[in-house]
Amino acid sequence: MARRYTRVITSPAAARIPREWNRPFVSLLSDWGVRDPSPAICRGVVLSIAPDALIVDISHEVDKFNIRHGALLLWCALPFLPIGAHVAVVDPGVGSSRRPIAIETARGDYLVGPDNGLLLPGAERLGGIERVHAIENTQYLLPVLSSTFHGRDLFTPAGAHLALGVPLEYIGPPVDPAGLATLDWPQVGVRPGELETAVIYRDTFGNLKLAGLIADLHEALGGIERGEELAVRVGGGGRRRTERVRWASTFSDVAVGECLLYEDSYGRLCLARNQGSAAAALRLDEGTPLTITRPATRLAAGSAAKATDEETQPSVAARPAD
């Protein structure tokens, strides 16, 4: 099955942002947290290079070392940000042989970070990869490169220079996009009557974002009615269990405490619980594979109706053999 991160979605907000931004724009994302000074230090590095830069912190609370989590937050945020340089650092391999890279996207942004798959969904979200260059030219880095803080010494200064208009090819040599490290991103299986997916992120409310978009669900199940009951099958073999949820457009479509499946504000499928935690109620967490179908009772009823219908119709199969 082909790996697929997303379909490209262009947000109305992004469409209204002028391509020629009148200030350098830099966004920052990391798993550093905010207790230590790392985020402030990197903001300072940007301002030392581009004093007029507008800086936005996407998040510094990415789960520690969780590349998939960081990639998802980039995927969600980037279409709503101005065109600029987006520095992302979730880098368990810092100081190793992994490459530092800068990606130019079709929208005109630069994504700067480690070559570990972190940047790929965001790049696809912005129209796809145009060019990739390794970050090697020390002229655009801090004078001393530590072995454990490439966010400060390498990624942030490179991003700031790109935001100022330094050509990408000045940063370092080109890299074949086909050779980039891929992301361990759950694949979506679409078959008649069922959608195979997995939990990719649990938010602070206990909502569970799934691999796959609303179009995948429609392709698998056909038309879905608001309020329709769906079955969520978890596990396999003797440990398999099935949970029931409602297809809804908002939390109040179901009773307090009831679980629902809905399309979230980013176009992703999401399991939630009205005024509660879907993760706790459904006993699911990140990485859990699951299958979404219609309940067996409805399928059985539909099959019975079809059989009754067929009994009333002439059947060519009933023709006597020659």
Segments and roles (model prediction):
Residues 2-97:
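N-terminal glycine-/serine-/threonine-rich phosphate-binding loop
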Residues 142-225:
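Anionic-ligand-binding alpha/beta catalytic cores of soluble enzymes and soluble regulatory domains
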